[in-house]
């Protein structure tokens, strides 16, 4: 199950209370204080692990608490520190204050370890309060309460290339043939119901990560279809690949215009991201001469429109995932763009 957003209360452990205790030995009837300190409460720690892919482990949990520190004991024995609660999350997880929407943590690197809530300090035992005028103090400190915070965990997948397109245009087929991802593929819309990540090996030394999200429909930025819930997953991609389908009723030019508008409505930053254009199902020209002519006109209209707006795309390529034509060229084009973006960081 793909879970990418949860609301939960997190609390660090309370400090243990200090002990009130006095030495009790056979020949020492009025022994001095020997109360130990309380242990510190456990901390809440986030750990970023790329073997974890969703927030499903947090599903249905309203609160998670670290262990309280143990109380102090006699004979100056300090209480044990409460166990830390280590929360393992996928790369791309943000910890957000549920009330203010402030981003408190941004976990983006494998192995990243962040202290989120510090456990409460243990109270001092009565040993600490002995002085000249009070040789037998009968009080100790209570432990300090741990911290508590209502947060929202949001997962934004991190990938180099994000696929953008309408439902059933060939995005899932593409990612299945160029990467190790195995999405469900069928001839109906919204086959992809959750984001998919795939590692694309270009050659022996170079690879990049591609993500496929559920198809965007007109109005996705306003909440229609599945697009809005998952558009955030391409916010962290370095490069966008628009996948346009010449078999759709909507012309290629119109597909491109609508998709760009939806991105612009969702995020100015996403709209300004570098992108390429892939025309999928290029094998469809084999369906007959008349059909091939229609597709050629369709592509020509798109190319003319792109010229009018000064060719904002990095490249335009025709690909057939079925016949595996254009795939090698596409992978090298994407790698070139990603390398350039990495070098400019």
From Swiss-Prot:
It is found in: Cytoplasm. Mg(2+) binds at residues 172, 192. Its cofactor is Mg(2+). Gene3D superfamilies: GTP1/OBG domain, P-loop containing nucleotide triphosphate hydrolases. The keyword Ribosomal protein does not apply. GO terms for biological process: ribosome biogenesis. HAMAP family: GTPase_Obg (MF_01454). InterPro entries: G_OBG, GTP-bd, GTP-bd_Obg/CgtA, GTP1-OBG_CS, GTP1_OBG_dom, GTP1_OBG_dom_sf, OBG_GTPase, P-loop_NTPase. This is GTPase Obg.
């Amino acid at each position: 199950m793909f879970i990418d957003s949860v609301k939960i209360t997190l609390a660090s452990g309370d400090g243990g209370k200090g002990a009130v205790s006095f030495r009790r030995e056979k020949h020492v009837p009025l022994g001095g204080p020997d109360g130990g300190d309380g242990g510190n409460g456990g901390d809440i720690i986030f750990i970023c692990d790329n073997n974890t892919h969703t927030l499903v482990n947090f599903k249905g949990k309203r609160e998670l608490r670290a262990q309280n520190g143990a109380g102090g004991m006699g004979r100056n024995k300090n209480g044990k520190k409460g166990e830390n609660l280590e929360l393992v999350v996928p790369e791309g997880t943000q910890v957000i204050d549920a009330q203010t929407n402030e981003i408190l943590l941004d976990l983006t690197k494998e192995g990243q370890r962040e202290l989120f809530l510090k456990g409460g300090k243990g109270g001092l035992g009565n040993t600490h309060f002995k002085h000249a005028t009070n040789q037998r103090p009968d009080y100790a400190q209570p432990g300090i309460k741990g911290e508590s915070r209502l947060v929202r965990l949001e997962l934004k997948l991190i990938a180099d290339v994000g696929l953008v397109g309408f439902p059933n245009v060939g995005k899932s087929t593409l990612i299945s043939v160029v990467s190790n991802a195995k999405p469900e593929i069928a001839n109906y819309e919204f086959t992809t119901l959750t984001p998919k990540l795939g590692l694309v090996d270009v050659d022996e030394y170079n690879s990049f990560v591609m993500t496929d999200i559920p198809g965007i429909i007109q109005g996705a930025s306003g909440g229609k279809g599945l697009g809005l819930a998952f558009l955030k997953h391409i916010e962290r991609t370095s490069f966008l690949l628009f996948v346009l389908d010449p078999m759709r009723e909507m012309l290629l030019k119109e597909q491109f215009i609508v998709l760009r508008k939806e991105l612009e409505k969702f995020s100015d930053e996403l709209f300004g991201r570098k992108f390429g254009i892939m025309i999928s199902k290029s094998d469809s020209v084999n369906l007959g001469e008349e059909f091939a002519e229609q597709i050629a006109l369709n592509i020509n209209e798109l190319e003319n429109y792109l010229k009018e707006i000064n060719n904002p795309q990095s490249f335009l390529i025709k690909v057939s995932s079925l016949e595996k034509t254009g795939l090698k060229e596409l992978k090298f084009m994407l790698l070139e763009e990603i390398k350039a973006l990495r070098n400019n960081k």
